[in-house]
Amino acid sequence: MILRTAKEIEDARAAAMCVVETHRRLAGWLRVGHTLAEVDAFCGSIFEELKCKSAFIGYKVRGHPPFRSHTCLSVNDMVVHGEHDATPLAEGDLLALDIGVKHRGMIGDAAWTYSIGSATEMGKRLQACGRESLRRGIAAIKAGRPMIEWAKAVQGYVERDCRFHLVRGLGGHGIGHTLHESPYIANTPPSYPGEWTEAWKPFEKGMLIAVEPMISAGTTEIRSKGNAWPIWTADGSLSVHYEADVMVTDDGCEVFTAALDELPDVVGGKA
Protein backbone atom coordinates (compact mmCIF):
# COMPACT_ATOMS: atom_id res chain seq x y z
CA MET A 1 0.00 0.00 0.00
CA ILE A 2 1.14 3.54 -0.75
CA LEU A 3 1.26 5.65 2.41
CA ARG A 4 -0.19 9.10 1.78
CA THR A 5 1.11 12.34 3.23
CA ALA A 6 -1.19 14.75 5.05
CA LYS A 7 -1.06 17.04 2.02
CA GLU A 8 -2.00 14.23 -0.38
CA ILE A 9 -4.98 13.35 1.81
CA GLU A 10 -6.13 16.96 1.93
CA ASP A 11 -5.72 17.25 -1.84
CA ALA A 12 -7.74 14.05 -2.32
CA ARG A 13 -10.52 15.55 -0.19
CA ALA A 14 -10.45 18.66 -2.37
CA ALA A 15 -10.63 16.56 -5.55
CA ALA A 16 -13.59 14.63 -4.14
CA MET A 17 -15.36 17.89 -3.36
CA CYS A 18 -14.93 18.96 -6.99
CA VAL A 19 -16.77 15.78 -7.95
CA VAL A 20 -19.52 16.45 -5.38
CA GLU A 21 -19.97 20.03 -6.58
CA THR A 22 -20.18 18.87 -10.20
CA HIS A 23 -22.92 16.38 -9.28
CA ARG A 24 -24.79 19.09 -7.34
CA ARG A 25 -24.78 21.45 -10.29
CA LEU A 26 -25.78 18.73 -12.71
CA ALA A 27 -28.66 17.63 -10.48
CA GLY A 28 -30.06 21.15 -10.64
CA TRP A 29 -29.54 21.50 -14.39
CA LEU A 30 -30.51 18.15 -15.94
CA ARG A 31 -33.77 18.10 -17.89
CA VAL A 32 -35.75 15.84 -20.19
CA GLY A 33 -34.54 16.58 -23.72
CA HIS A 34 -30.94 17.43 -22.90
CA THR A 35 -28.61 15.40 -25.09
CA LEU A 36 -25.71 13.43 -23.68
CA ALA A 37 -23.40 15.75 -25.63
CA GLU A 38 -24.93 18.75 -23.85
CA VAL A 39 -24.55 17.05 -20.48
CA ASP A 40 -20.90 16.28 -21.16
CA ALA A 41 -20.20 19.82 -22.34
CA PHE A 42 -21.82 21.21 -19.19
CA CYS A 43 -19.56 18.95 -17.11
CA GLY A 44 -16.56 20.31 -18.95
CA SER A 45 -17.60 23.89 -18.19
CA ILE A 46 -17.98 23.06 -14.50
CA PHE A 47 -14.51 21.52 -14.43
CA GLU A 48 -13.05 24.71 -15.89
CA GLU A 49 -14.78 26.82 -13.26
CA LEU A 50 -13.60 24.54 -10.44
CA LYS A 51 -10.06 24.49 -11.84
CA CYS A 52 -9.97 20.71 -12.18
CA LYS A 53 -9.50 18.44 -15.18
CA SER A 54 -11.38 15.39 -16.36
CA ALA A 55 -9.66 12.18 -15.31
CA PHE A 56 -11.46 10.32 -18.10
CA ILE A 57 -11.08 12.25 -21.35
CA GLY A 58 -8.23 10.75 -23.34
CA TYR A 59 -7.95 7.78 -20.95
CA LYS A 60 -6.38 4.78 -22.65
CA VAL A 61 -6.47 1.04 -22.06
CA ARG A 62 -5.26 -1.66 -24.40
CA GLY A 63 -7.75 -2.56 -27.09
CA HIS A 64 -9.79 0.66 -26.84
CA PRO A 65 -9.53 4.07 -28.47
CA PRO A 66 -8.90 7.00 -26.11
CA PHE A 67 -12.03 7.80 -24.10
CA ARG A 68 -13.55 10.91 -25.66
CA SER A 69 -15.88 12.33 -23.01
CA HIS A 70 -15.33 14.42 -19.90
CA THR A 71 -17.47 12.02 -17.90
CA CYS A 72 -19.12 8.61 -18.22
CA LEU A 73 -22.79 8.90 -19.19
CA SER A 74 -24.63 5.57 -19.01
CA VAL A 75 -28.37 5.34 -19.70
CA ASN A 76 -30.78 2.56 -18.68
CA ASP A 77 -29.24 -0.82 -19.61
CA MET A 78 -25.77 0.68 -20.09
CA VAL A 79 -23.90 -0.12 -16.89
CA VAL A 80 -20.76 1.99 -17.28
CA HIS A 81 -18.40 3.81 -19.66
CA GLY A 82 -20.97 5.56 -21.83
CA GLU A 83 -19.68 8.35 -24.07
CA HIS A 84 -21.51 11.48 -25.21
CA ASP A 85 -23.61 11.56 -28.37
CA ALA A 86 -26.74 13.30 -29.68
CA THR A 87 -29.15 11.03 -27.79
CA PRO A 88 -31.73 13.11 -25.87
CA LEU A 89 -32.69 12.13 -22.35
CA ALA A 90 -36.27 10.85 -22.14
CA GLU A 91 -38.80 10.92 -19.32
CA GLY A 92 -38.04 8.11 -16.87
CA ASP A 93 -34.52 7.39 -18.14
CA LEU A 94 -31.97 6.23 -15.60
CA LEU A 95 -28.76 8.22 -16.11
CA ALA A 96 -25.64 7.04 -14.28
CA LEU A 97 -23.06 9.83 -14.19
CA ASP A 98 -19.56 8.71 -13.25
CA ILE A 99 -17.46 11.82 -12.70
CA GLY A 100 -13.69 11.65 -12.34
CA VAL A 101 -11.40 14.64 -11.93
CA LYS A 102 -7.79 15.45 -11.23
CA HIS A 103 -7.30 18.39 -8.88
CA ARG A 104 -4.19 19.47 -7.03
CA GLY A 105 -2.50 16.32 -8.31
CA MET A 106 -5.04 13.86 -6.86
CA ILE A 107 -8.03 11.98 -8.22
CA GLY A 108 -11.67 12.31 -7.22
CA ASP A 109 -14.03 9.70 -8.69
CA ALA A 110 -17.68 9.12 -7.81
CA ALA A 111 -20.85 8.01 -9.59
CA TRP A 112 -24.53 8.63 -8.89
CA THR A 113 -27.69 7.60 -10.74
CA TYR A 114 -30.58 9.93 -11.54
CA SER A 115 -34.10 9.39 -12.85
CA ILE A 116 -34.83 12.02 -15.48
CA GLY A 117 -38.13 13.89 -15.13
CA SER A 118 -39.86 11.10 -13.21
CA ALA A 119 -39.00 7.66 -11.89
CA THR A 120 -40.44 4.33 -12.98
CA GLU A 121 -41.26 1.83 -10.26
CA MET A 122 -38.28 -0.31 -11.27
CA GLY A 123 -36.09 2.78 -11.35
CA LYS A 124 -37.12 3.71 -7.80
CA ARG A 125 -36.33 0.23 -6.53
CA LEU A 126 -32.95 0.11 -8.23
CA GLN A 127 -31.95 3.55 -7.00
CA ALA A 128 -32.96 2.74 -3.43
CA CYS A 129 -31.03 -0.51 -3.62
CA GLY A 130 -27.95 1.20 -5.04
CA ARG A 131 -27.85 3.91 -2.39
CA GLU A 132 -28.36 1.49 0.50
CA SER A 133 -25.90 -1.10 -0.82
CA LEU A 134 -23.21 1.59 -0.94
CA ARG A 135 -23.99 2.64 2.64
CA ARG A 136 -23.95 -0.95 3.91
CA GLY A 137 -20.73 -1.75 2.12
CA ILE A 138 -19.01 1.34 3.49
CA ALA A 139 -20.16 0.41 7.00
CA ALA A 140 -18.21 -2.87 6.63
CA ILE A 141 -14.92 -1.11 5.84
CA LYS A 142 -12.44 -0.81 8.69
CA ALA A 143 -8.66 -1.08 9.01
CA GLY A 144 -7.71 -4.70 9.63
CA ARG A 145 -10.84 -6.24 8.11
CA PRO A 146 -10.44 -8.30 4.94
CA MET A 147 -11.73 -6.62 1.80
CA ILE A 148 -14.14 -9.49 1.23
CA GLU A 149 -16.28 -8.05 4.05
CA TRP A 150 -17.18 -5.14 1.77
CA ALA A 151 -18.30 -7.59 -0.92
CA LYS A 152 -20.28 -9.74 1.51
CA ALA A 153 -22.19 -6.73 2.79
CA VAL A 154 -22.99 -5.42 -0.67
CA GLN A 155 -23.91 -8.77 -2.20
CA GLY A 156 -26.05 -9.81 0.74
CA TYR A 157 -28.17 -6.70 0.48
CA VAL A 158 -28.43 -6.48 -3.32
CA GLU A 159 -28.99 -10.13 -4.16
CA ARG A 160 -30.72 -11.49 -1.05
CA ASP A 161 -32.73 -8.51 0.20
CA CYS A 162 -33.42 -6.60 -3.04
CA ARG A 163 -33.48 -9.58 -5.43
CA PHE A 164 -31.32 -7.71 -7.93
CA HIS A 165 -27.90 -8.63 -9.33
CA LEU A 166 -24.38 -7.26 -9.00
CA VAL A 167 -22.71 -7.35 -12.39
CA ARG A 168 -19.57 -9.48 -12.45
CA GLY A 169 -16.16 -8.41 -13.69
CA LEU A 170 -16.43 -4.78 -12.58
CA GLY A 171 -15.44 -3.27 -9.24
CA GLY A 172 -13.80 -0.53 -7.24
CA HIS A 173 -10.17 0.47 -6.98
CA GLY A 174 -7.55 2.48 -5.21
CA ILE A 175 -7.20 6.16 -6.07
CA GLY A 176 -4.35 8.60 -5.72
CA HIS A 177 -2.27 10.41 -8.30
CA THR A 178 -3.70 8.14 -11.01
CA LEU A 179 -7.25 6.98 -11.69
CA HIS A 180 -6.96 3.24 -11.14
CA GLU A 181 -4.54 2.09 -8.45
CA SER A 182 -4.40 -1.05 -6.36
CA PRO A 183 -6.22 -2.66 -4.70
CA TYR A 184 -9.02 -3.95 -6.91
CA ILE A 185 -12.21 -4.21 -4.84
CA ALA A 186 -14.81 -6.61 -6.23
CA ASN A 187 -18.48 -6.31 -5.28
CA THR A 188 -18.93 -10.05 -4.84
CA PRO A 189 -16.81 -12.67 -3.08
CA PRO A 190 -14.67 -14.81 -5.41
CA SER A 191 -16.45 -17.84 -6.84
CA TYR A 192 -13.30 -19.69 -7.95
CA PRO A 193 -9.58 -19.62 -7.05
CA GLY A 194 -7.79 -16.68 -8.61
CA GLU A 195 -10.92 -14.66 -9.40
CA TRP A 196 -10.17 -11.97 -6.81
CA THR A 197 -6.76 -12.59 -5.31
CA GLU A 198 -6.91 -9.64 -2.89
CA ALA A 199 -10.19 -10.66 -1.26
CA TRP A 200 -8.59 -11.70 2.02
CA LYS A 201 -6.12 -8.84 2.21
CA PRO A 202 -7.00 -6.38 4.97
CA PHE A 203 -8.05 -2.82 4.52
CA GLU A 204 -5.22 -0.65 5.82
CA LYS A 205 -5.39 2.65 7.63
CA GLY A 206 -4.93 5.52 5.18
CA MET A 207 -6.01 3.59 2.07
CA LEU A 208 -7.74 5.84 -0.46
CA ILE A 209 -10.31 3.82 -2.40
CA ALA A 210 -13.30 4.27 -4.69
CA VAL A 211 -15.98 1.66 -3.97
CA GLU A 212 -18.79 1.21 -6.48
CA PRO A 213 -21.71 -1.23 -6.66
CA MET A 214 -23.03 -1.71 -10.21
CA ILE A 215 -26.46 -3.29 -10.10
CA SER A 216 -28.67 -4.88 -12.74
CA ALA A 217 -32.36 -5.69 -12.52
CA GLY A 218 -32.04 -8.95 -14.41
CA THR A 219 -28.57 -10.48 -14.72
CA THR A 220 -25.02 -10.67 -13.47
CA GLU A 221 -23.70 -10.79 -17.03
CA ILE A 222 -22.49 -7.92 -19.19
CA ARG A 223 -21.76 -7.37 -22.88
CA SER A 224 -19.83 -4.93 -25.03
CA LYS A 225 -19.31 -4.29 -28.74
CA GLY A 226 -15.85 -4.78 -30.20
CA ASN A 227 -13.41 -2.20 -28.93
CA ALA A 228 -16.13 0.29 -27.93
CA TRP A 229 -16.12 1.56 -24.35
CA PRO A 230 -19.76 1.11 -23.23
CA ILE A 231 -20.73 -1.95 -21.21
CA TRP A 232 -24.37 -3.07 -21.11
CA THR A 233 -26.35 -5.61 -19.14
CA ALA A 234 -26.40 -8.82 -21.18
CA ASP A 235 -30.20 -9.08 -21.09
CA GLY A 236 -31.04 -5.41 -21.65
CA SER A 237 -32.33 -4.92 -18.11
CA LEU A 238 -32.01 -1.60 -16.28
CA SER A 239 -28.94 -0.83 -14.20
CA VAL A 240 -27.65 1.70 -11.67
CA HIS A 241 -24.16 2.72 -10.54
CA TYR A 242 -23.16 4.34 -7.25
CA GLU A 243 -19.58 5.16 -6.24
CA ALA A 244 -17.94 6.89 -3.28
CA ASP A 245 -14.40 7.95 -2.38
CA VAL A 246 -13.34 6.84 1.09
CA MET A 247 -10.26 6.80 3.29
CA VAL A 248 -9.89 3.80 5.59
CA THR A 249 -9.46 4.58 9.29
CA ASP A 250 -8.98 2.55 12.46
CA ASP A 251 -12.66 2.78 13.38
CA GLY A 252 -14.21 2.72 9.91
CA CYS A 253 -13.66 5.21 7.13
CA GLU A 254 -14.02 8.84 6.17
CA VAL A 255 -16.31 9.26 3.17
CA PHE A 256 -14.94 12.15 1.14
CA THR A 257 -18.05 12.19 -1.08
CA ALA A 258 -20.63 11.78 1.71
CA ALA A 259 -22.58 14.84 0.52
CA LEU A 260 -23.70 12.90 -2.57
CA ASP A 261 -26.24 11.16 -0.37
CA GLU A 262 -28.14 14.47 -0.17
CA LEU A 263 -28.78 14.48 -3.93
CA PRO A 264 -32.29 13.82 -5.27
CA ASP A 265 -33.16 10.61 -7.05
CA VAL A 266 -35.36 12.40 -9.59
CA VAL A 267 -34.09 15.48 -11.42
CA GLY A 268 -35.50 17.92 -13.95
CA GLY A 269 -38.52 18.12 -16.16
CA LYS A 270 -38.77 19.10 -19.80
CA ALA A 271 -36.15 21.57 -21.04
Question: Language-model segments: which ranges?
Answer:
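Active-site neighborhoods and metal-handling regions in enzymes and metal-associated proteins
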Residues: 1-271
